[in-house]
Design a protein with these regions (language model features):
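Short amphipathic helical patch at the helix-1/turn junction of helix-turn-helix
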Residues: 74, 108-109
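Short glycine/proline-centered loop/turn elements that form peptide/ligand docking sites
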Residues: 88, 111-114, 131-136
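Acetyl-CoA-dependent GNAT
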Residues: 5-9, 13-77, 81, 85-94, ...
Length: 154
């Protein structure tokens, strides 16, 4: 499996992944297309590719010393195979290379699988945002400081 920067040829696969994994929270085709095309200069789209098939994607923004992980989504049949870990490690490396000293993200409070994944990767809860999502769900805000070994869980 390879993690690489997304290209315009990946837009349809990313949009499909958004719909499959994020449902009502999925981003529009236009927004994905704009981001992949580089028209959002602080936003980085990554894809995980296996045998020429997109099996996951990640989106992160980088502004000054803060990176925000906006998305990690993995196709159902490729979960628990290290895809999310590989995408996260690439985001952490990208953030560190861009001068970030921390990574923030939000995750639904009822998403136990994601909360467990991020905790295992060194993220800690720093806040909660009530009614953050369109359906009124609360978001848990997580943070990970970047330092030496940031791409390997440290």
């Amino acid at each position: 499996m390879t993690v690489r920067a997304a290209t315009p040829a990946d837009v349809e696969a990313i949009v499909a992944s958004e719909a499959e994994n994020l449902g009502a929270d999925a981003w529009s085709h236009a927004l994905v297309e704009e981001g992949v095309a580089g028209r959002l200069p602080t936003v980085h789209y990554l894809v995980a590719e296996e045998r020429e098939q997109i099996v996951g994607h990640a989106v992160a923004s980088l502004v000054d010393d803060v990176a925000e992980l906006q998305r990690i989504a993995v196709a159902a049949e490729h979960r628990r195979a290290g895809v999310a870990t590989d995408l996260l490690n690439e985001v952490l490396a990208l953030a560190a290379a861009g001068g970030a000293d921390r990574v923030l993200l939000e995750v639904r409070e009822d998403n136990a699988e994601a909360l467990g994944f991020y905790a295992a990767e060194g993220f800690v809860e720093v806040d909660r945002r009530a009614r953050y999502y369109a359906d009124g769900s609360t978001a848990v805000v997580l943070r990970r400081s970047l330092g030496r070994g940031c791409g390997s869980g440290g």
